Amino acid sequence: MSQGKIVQIIGAVVDVEFPRDMIPRVYDALKLDENGLTLEVQQLLGDGVVRTIAMGSSDGLKRGMTVSNTGAPITVPVGKGTLGRIVDVLGTPVDEAGPIDTDKSRAIHQAAPKFDELSSTTELLETGIKVIDLLCPFAKGGKVGLFGGAGVGKTVNMMELINNIAKAHSGLSVFAGVGERTREGNDFYHEMKDSNVLDKVAMVYGQMNEPPGNRLRVALTGLTMAEYFRDEKDENGKGRDVLFFVDNIYRYTLAGTEVSALLGRMPSAVGYQPTLAEEMGRLQERITSTQTGSITSIQAVYVPADDLTDPSPATTFAHLDATVVLSRDIASLGIYPAVDPLDSTSRQLDPMVLGQEHYDVARGVQSTLQKYKELRDIIAILGMDELSDEDKLTVMRARKIQRFLSQPFHVAEVFTGSPGKYVALRDTIAGFKAILNGEYDHLPEQAFYMVGSIEEAVEKAKTLN
């Protein structure tokens, strides 16, 4: 095992000099002899000097300190022993519940599955959230992004999806908290514990307070655990269907941006690292379904300043099967989940996959809402009275649809006081189809606000009269 000495420290970036004949490879993990801090090699600068990123705080480091090469990338524990536990980027438990009971470990840097190993699926994953199931349905083994600016409900939506899918899902889940609030990580842990599904979830946290090196790699640690569960074969030679939640993928990009300039790279558009697309691709190409097992991933994506054309969310879009866009305009109307029904898309929105009825209802809802959007300027200037009877009817139905797309969440019960609702897909389709066909034109629009199925709207209308 070769040893080197620290020659330069700039924030999270540390340069280490090794003997010329014992230079470590890129991505090798180095360990500081004095305090056990892990460094990951990023570049070979020549003359025996390597540039590394610290996985923890670089406070207190001095030039001349001894560093040992472990000869391998960062490896983390995997397997059943990680379930119900919280680990950090290095796989070290941080929940004060003793060491992790597993003898298996894996390097966090793995090659993506080969093209002939991949498998595609068109089986739908019911979420119980009306707007998602109707307009941007998820596929089992697919990739979903929840896009939104600050405070429009990405984490709450993700928690509700975890509540509806992970609890009903008999398989295993991995949750990677990348650069988010520690409080949310804590809430998630207790939510899982109270629901008695903690023994099916592995949690990997690298929260906001961690140095950039830690946040840059914590998503890979979580993914490595999920990949192991996917690839581990049972007696029939089949892998598992794993759920992989990431909150938030933007912080992964941001951590790369923070260290990019320190690594000596020229910044690209908006100050992002020039390797943005490659870094994102390396992570996303591993989150995939193979012929052995599947990973269904749900990723929250922060949108800086609500600008979807920002390079970070724009790069993420290319990798996803379904995009759920959360809108501040819809949130300001008090409609939650604040999903934009016209911006959100899914590859599954196809009559060959969904069936003709679901497809027709979804497109009918979107065209009604689009027509309403076009008429809003006229209404603002001239008022409703200037519209034709047909347009008045369209506006009335669109406003009912808009309100019916809202839904009380289980995870928000403590804030709203309304019990959460899970709506089956067939009830969702039947409800919207009836509104489009004019069966509920006689009901007031507030009857459709924050209810589950259409029957609840009818009951609510009785109390309003």
Curated annotation (Swiss-Prot):
Its EC number is 7.1.2.2. PROSITE patterns: ATPASE_ALPHA_BETA (PS00152). It catalyses: ATP + H2O + 4 H(+)(in) = ADP + phosphate + 5 H(+)(out). Its main location: membrane. Keywords: ATP synthesis, ATP-binding, Cell inner membrane, Cell membrane, CF(1), Hydrogen ion transport, Ion transport, Membrane, Nucleotide-binding, Translocase, Transport. It is an enzyme of class 7 (translocase). Pfam families: ATP-synt_ab (PF00006), ATP-synt_ab_N (PF02874), ATP-synt_VA_C (PF22919). It is found in: Cell inner membrane. It comes from the Bacteria. Belongs to the ATPase alpha/beta chains family. Produces ATP from ADP in the presence of a proton gradient across the membrane. The catalytic sites are hosted primarily by the beta subunits. This is ATP synthase subunit beta.
